[in-house]
């Protein structure tokens, strides 16, 4: 079903993710291997995005219960939001779309187990790894990945992590900074609006700015 998403877009004349992504550098590096493998071949992807779980301490308006446990908790308590086009963040609708994650302990999640079984082989040719969430700093697998990368250097790997920079426990940010200090190069992308005192996010701006300042000072 995952592939059919791109097929449907292409059938109506759209530009699908697979067409867009196939033009990026990491895909070009695998062209010969893809051609040799053929249509029925099986090769390791060069670009992987992983979401270990939906745990998050925020409920950003543009987000959703299937990507934030805090959002899910609020919707369960108060119900979906009535808007012009219907109900926003309706749990029944998300469930029918099979977007709500299965409630399992980390050590019982078959998808996480499968990821770590595959990881050593995948890592050999991986060029881009994105860790999203939820809030990635709330998941131990994020730190496990960082430890593995440190112990097994990959000069070709570009790794990114999407974080709100204010995990619920300060020690999580401390651990993150400690791991980053061991990496060779760090690049930062941020949205200035999120750190704007006039944005209405005053409760968030102060701790976020503090953590962000520490983050950018990592050498």
Where are these regions (language model features)?
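Flexible mid-to-C-terminal extensions adjoining Fe-S/redox cofactors in radical SAM and related proteins
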Residues: 1-53, 62, 66-89
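Acidic, low-complexity intrinsically disordered regions
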Residues: 22, 112-114, 199
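Alpha-helical packing segments of well-folded alpha/beta enzyme cores
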Residues: 1-2, 48, 115-118, 145
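A Trp-anchored, charged/polar loop motif used as the substrate-binding/catalytic surface
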Residues: 28-41, 107-120, 174, 180
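Residues in intrinsically disordered, low-complexity segments of regulatory proteins
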Residues: 25, 115-118, 188, 202
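Core AdoMet radical
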Residues: 45-55, 66-110, 123-140, 152-174, ...
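Glycine-centered loop/turn positions within well-structured domains
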Residues: 58
């Amino acid at each position: 079903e995952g592939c059919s998403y791109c097929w449907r877009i292409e059938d109506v004349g759209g530009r699908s993710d697979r067409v867009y992504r196939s033009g990026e550098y990491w895909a070009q590096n695998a062209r010969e291997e893809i051609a040799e493998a053929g249509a029925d071949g099986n090769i390791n992807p060069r670009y992987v995005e992983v979401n270990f779980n939906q745990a998050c301490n925020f409920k950003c308006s543009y987000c959703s219960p299937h990507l934030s446990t805090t959002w899910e908790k609020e919707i369960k308590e108060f119900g979906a939001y009535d808007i012009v086009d219907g109900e926003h963040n309706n749990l029944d609708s998300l469930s029918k779309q099979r977007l709500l994650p299965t409630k399992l302990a980390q050590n019982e999640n078959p998808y996480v187990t499968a990821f770590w079984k595959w990881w050593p082989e995948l890592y050999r040719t991986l060029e881009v790894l994105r860790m999203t969430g939820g809030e990635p700093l709330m998941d131990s697998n994020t730190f496990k990945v960082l430890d593995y990368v440190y112990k097994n250097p990959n000069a070709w790997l570009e790794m990114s992590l999407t974080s709100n920079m204010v995990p619920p426990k300060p020690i999580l940010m401390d651990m993150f900074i400690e791991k980053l200090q061991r990496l060779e190069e760090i690049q930062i992308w941020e949205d200035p609006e999120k750190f704007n005192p006039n944005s209405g996010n005053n409760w968030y701006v102060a701790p976020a700015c503090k953590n962000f300042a520490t983050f950018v000072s990592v050498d």
